[in-house]
Regions:
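Bacterial N-terminal signal peptides that target proteins for export
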Residues: 1-8
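Sec/Tat signal peptide C-region and signal peptidase I cleavage site
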Residues: 17-23
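A residue-level marker of the well-folded mature domains of exported/periplasmic proteins
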Residues: 23-333
Length: 333
């Protein structure tokens, strides 16, 4: 079928090392990416980085599939399972229904899903406490803003993205109770993750209303938000992967989700014969989320700003600060 043309040509591999590693009854990992492409400079690319790390350390090839739309998820998982790939990593919450169906058909194959819970014994569900990481970048945004107006551009309007927004708003209000958040969602369908042009339009509309710092949690759509900030001389906050390098000088920071670690840990555990199903929720304490400070944004973050963000981080980890999770009650309160 056309869907599978070149599927197994797409491998993360290191050439000569692959055959010996595979001959030793090693793991045969695979990845089904989310829509938007492997090199989306965000979520998918973070998973790819984790896979590359595993491949570099072990020499084991990783089969990959980049779907063009969500209807391909189920067949991708089924074909990988039929070919003996294990574990199979599903990138993104939108694969949950397809993965659950296929995982029931193949109870002896292990699956890992990132960003959603599928309660089956052969599924490892890795979620993140995005509200905690978003709180930190909210603190930084409030400290960096001169206008007191801060923007948020989300992708698809779903509870998960509301979780980002809610955590961000709490961080803003923690640092500056008088600050105003102006928020927009890109859309209500999966297309909202892959529309940089619309992201740029929304960001520009916010800038016209006085926003001088904007946070994008919108997949590939966010690339347009970051570009618009550069074009207008405003500050932007990236998401999932460290996006600071995209526009040094206007990237205030990035809220990092260690999706790379989720993929790497799944592959490594399978290879070590220690893989287990269940649910893992990774927050600041677990090293699953954080904010990025490096050579590309260090000139934008004063020592005083860093100290305040680090103090908030320590207080969240200790329990002194509790960041409300929007998904606990579908409300930001």
């Amino acid at each position: 079928m056309k869907l599978w043309t070149g599927l197994f040509v797409s491998l993360i591999a290191t050439g000569a090392l692959v055959a010996p590693a595979m001959a030793q009854n090693a793991a045969k990992p695979a990845i089904v990416y989310s829509t938007g492409g492997k090199f989306d400079k965000s979520f998918n690319e973070g998973v790819s980085q984790g896979a590359q790390r595993f491949n570099k350390e072990t020499g084991i090839a990783i089969a990959e599939f980049e779907p063009s739309n969500e209807t391909q998820f189920e067949q991708a998982h089924r074909r990988f399972a039929q070919r003996g790939q294990d574990p199979i990593v599903a990138v993104g919450f939108s694969q949950a229904v397809a993965l659950e169906k296929v995982a029931k058909e193949f109870p002896n194959v292990n699956f890992t899903i990132i960003d959603m819970v599928v309660p089956l014994p052969n599924v490892q569900s890795v979620t993140f406490k995005e509200h905690e990481g978003s709180f930190l970048v909210g603190v930084l945004a409030a400290l960096a803003s001169k206008s007191g107006k801060i923007g948020f551009v989300g992708g698809m309007d779903i509870p998960l993205i509301r979780r980002f927004q809610c955590g961000f708003e709490q961080g803003i209000k923690y640092a500056n109770p008088k600050a105003e958040l102006i928020a927009n969602m890109t859309g209500t369908t999966p297309a909202a993750w892959n529309d940089p042009g619309r992201g740029a339009e929304l960001a520009k509309g916010q800038f016209d209303r006085g926003v001088d710092v904007v946070y994008a949690a919108a997949g590939s759509t966010g690339i347009g938000v970051l570009q618009a900030a550069k074009d207008r001389g405003k500050l932007a906050i990236g998401v999932d992967s460290n996006q600071n390098h995209l526009h040094p000088g206007t990237m205030l920071t990035s809220m990092i989700k260690r999706v790379d670690l989720a993929a790497y840990n799944s592959f490594k555990a399978a290879n070590d014969k220690s893989w287990k199903g269940g649910i893992a929720a990774l927050g600041l304490k677990e090293g699953g989320v954080d904010w990025a400070l490096d050579k590309d944004n260090e000139k934008l973050v004063t020592p005083e700003m860093k100290a305040k963000v680090d103090a908030a981080k320590a207080d969240i980890i200790s329990g002194k600060i509790t960041v409300h999770d929007y998904m606990s009650n579908n409300a930001c309160k």
